[in-house]
């Protein structure tokens, strides 16, 4: 079941790739993918190329995939291990969701962080109290780690 669904999503991604994103299997392991997200133009991550790993559980799509950044990023909802605080990867997961929709949701999280549900409270505080500083540090990290 999982493998069939993963193959279908791979074909759908090839046919209709989401804007600024790509994803596919690492070698022959269909349960382990690598994804790339281009930093959105209307964000301090503009120009960066961010790599992520995707691990599908054996009971996918009934359980969410594990998605994490491997490229370092300064963001209130993404920690230094690359873990992402995004409701659809946890409690709001639905089998109707696809990797394409997950990647687009992560893209919109880069444009619009959620400082009220932070994984890194200190970055959330800076985002809320000093947006210029947040944007500056985000741009610096993007240049340092994602270019």
From Swiss-Prot:
List the CDD domains.
UBCc_UBE2D (cd23792)
Q: What class of enzyme is it?
A: transferase
Q: Which residues form the active site?
A: 85
Question: What species is this protein from?
Answer: Sus scrofa (Pig)
Which reaction is catalysed here?
S-ubiquitinyl-[E1 ubiquitin-activating enzyme]-L-cysteine + [E2 ubiquitin-conjugating enzyme]-L-cysteine = [E1 ubiquitin-activating enzyme]-L-cysteine + S-ubiquitinyl-[E2 ubiquitin-conjugating enzyme]-L-cysteine; S-ubiquitinyl-[E1 ubiquitin-activating enzyme]-L-cysteine + [acceptor protein]-L-lysine = [E1 ubiquitin-activating enzyme]-L-cysteine + N(6)-monoubiquitinyl-[acceptor protein]-L-lysine
Q: Which UniProt keywords apply?
A: ATP-binding, Nucleotide-binding, Transferase, Ubl conjugation pathway
Task: Describe, as the record does, how this protein assembles with itself and its partners.
Answer: Interacts with SCF (SKP1-CUL1-F-box protein) E3 ubiquitin ligase complex. Interacts with CNOT4 (via RING domain). Interacts with E3 ubiquitin-protein ligases CBLC, PJA1 and PJA2. Interacts with PDZRN3. Interacts with PPP1R11. Interacts with E3 ubiquitin-protein ligase PHF7; the interaction inhibits cleavage of PHF7 and promotes association of the complex with the nucleosome core particle.
Q: Tell me the protein family, please.
A: Belongs to the ubiquitin-conjugating enzyme family.
User: GO terms for CC?
Assistant: nucleus
User: The UBC core domain covers which part of the protein?
Assistant: 1-147
Annotated protein name in UniProt: Ubiquitin-conjugating enzyme E2 D2
Gene name in the database record = UBE2D2
Q: Which InterPro entries match?
A: UBQ-conjugat_E2_core, UBQ-conjugating_AS, UBQ-conjugating_enzyme/RWD
Q: Which GO terms describe its molecular function?
A: ATP binding; ubiquitin conjugating enzyme activity; ubiquitin-protein transferase activity
Show the Pfam families listed in the entry: UQ_con
Q: In which pathway does it act?
A: Protein modification; protein ubiquitination
């Amino acid at each position: 079941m999982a493998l069939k669904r993963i193959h279908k999503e791979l074909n759908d991604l090839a046919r209709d790739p989401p804007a600024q994103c790509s994803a596919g299997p690492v070698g022959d392991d269909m349960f382990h993918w690598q994804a790339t997200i281009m930093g959105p133009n209307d964000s301090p991550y503009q120009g960066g190329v961010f790599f992520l790993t995707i691990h599908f559980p054996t009971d996918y799509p009934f359980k969410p995939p594990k998605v994490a950044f491997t490229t370092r990023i300064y963001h209130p909802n993404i920690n230094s291990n690359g873990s992402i605080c995004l409701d659809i990867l946890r409690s709001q997961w639905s089998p109707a969701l696809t990797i394409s929709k997950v990647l687009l949701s992560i893209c919109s999280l880069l444009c619009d962080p959620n400082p009220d549900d932070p994984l890194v409270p200190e970055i959330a505080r800076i985002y809320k109290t000093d947006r210029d500083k947040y944007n500056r540090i985000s741009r610096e990290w993007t240049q340092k780690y994602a270019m």
